[in-house]
Amino acid sequence: MMEAIKKKMQMLKLDKENALDRAEQAEAEQKQAEERSKQLEDELAAMQKKLKGTEDELDKYSEALKDAQEKLELAEKKAADAEAEVASLNRRIQLVEEELDRAQERLATALQKLEEAEKAADESERGMKVIENRALKDEEKMELQEIQLKEAKHIAEEADRKYEEVARKLVIIEGDLERTEERAELAESKCSELEEELKNVTNNLKSLEAQAEKYSQKEDKYEEEIKILTDKLKEAETRAEFAERSVAKLEKTIDDLEDELYAQKLKYKAISEELDHALNDMTSI
């Protein structure tokens, strides 16, 4: 009887030790599972943070591309406005040149009339000399000569009046011509300034076109980076899904281990109670 009890006690003790070992092992596995679960949760949080940074960077690249497109459109509008202004100034220059041609024609006409007046004055002067010579030679024709002299003076006065009128008109024409030339010079100066401005605008436009090409290359680069980031995003999402499944699996494993630990504790409690009963029985014997 004692031998059977001792053997049973040894078996109970061995079962107790095995139960303690399994309980300790279950607790160790539970701790490892919890640590692995926390590690996966940290990795998932890091991936989500990295994903948020990638989305912010993508928004920044999109905004930079939008600003570049707006600047290019503004440069094209300025170039178009400059070309329209140059065309308008070319038309104004053409009108000024036509007005200058008309002024030169009026000046040529005035000079011709002045030349005719000078010829008439010369002829009058020669007539006066002829009359004076005839007066010296023939006193009898004095009255006729005086009449001719008066006529000559009248012609001379008329010629002088015409000359003064022509001279006055010439001064006016010269003033008009001078003002026209000043306007033409001003127009030429303005045209030169506008040509220089157009040249600068053209250079700026070329620079903007180069920038646009550069922005286009950057856009291609950004698109490539976006594609890479999209692939990384998909990969991160896949890893996140896998991590979530792993966490769920580990949580289930932890639950199973906790259930097993609880069962082992119950079994240990039952063995302890059975061992206590056996010891009590031995004490009673």
UniProtKB/Swiss-Prot annotation:
GO terms for cellular component: actin cytoskeleton; actin filament; cytoskeleton; cytosol; extracellular exosome; mitochondrion; muscle thin filament tropomyosin; stress fiber. Keywords: Acetylation, Actin-binding, Chromosomal rearrangement, Coiled coil, Cytoplasm, Cytoskeleton, Disease variant, Muscle protein, Nemaline myopathy, Phosphoprotein, Proto-oncogene. The modification Phosphoserine is found at S62, S88, S207, S216, S272, S284. It comes from the Eukaryota. The keyword rRNA-binding does not apply. It is found in: Cytoplasm, Cytoskeleton. Residues 16-41 have a biased composition (Basic and acidic residues). It holds the Pfam family Tropomyosin. Residues 16-44 are annotated as: Disordered. The modification Phosphothreonine is found at T54, T109, T253, T283. Changing T253K: Found in patients with undefined congenital myopathy; likely pathogenic. The modification N-acetylmethionine is found at M2. The modification Phosphotyrosine is found at Y262. GO terms for molecular function: actin filament binding. Residues 1-285 form a coiled coil. GO terms for biological process: actin filament organization; muscle contraction. Homodimer. Heterodimer of an alpha (TPM1, TPM3 or TPM4) and a beta (TPM2) chain. Interacts with TMOD1. Interacts with TNNT1. It is linked to Congenital myopathy 4A, autosomal dominant: A muscular disorder characterized by onset of muscle weakness in infancy or childhood. Most affected individuals show mildly delayed motor development, hypotonia, generalized muscle weakness, and weakness of the proximal limb muscles and neck muscles, resulting in difficulty running and easy fatigability. Many patients have respiratory insufficiency with reduced vital capacity. Skeletal muscle biopsy shows nemaline rod inclusions, subsarcolemmal 'cap' structures, and fiber-type disproportion. The molecule is in a coiled coil structure that is formed by 2 polypeptide chains. The sequence exhibits a prominent seven-residues periodicity. Belongs to the tropomyosin family. Binds to actin filaments in muscle and non-muscle cells. Plays a central role, in association with the troponin complex, in the calcium dependent regulation of vertebrate striated muscle contraction. Smooth muscle contraction is regulated by interaction with caldesmon. In non-muscle cells is implicated in stabilizing cytoskeleton actin filaments. This is Tropomyosin alpha-3 chain. It comes from Homo sapiens. The lineage of its organism: Eukaryota, Metazoa, Chordata, Craniata, Vertebrata.
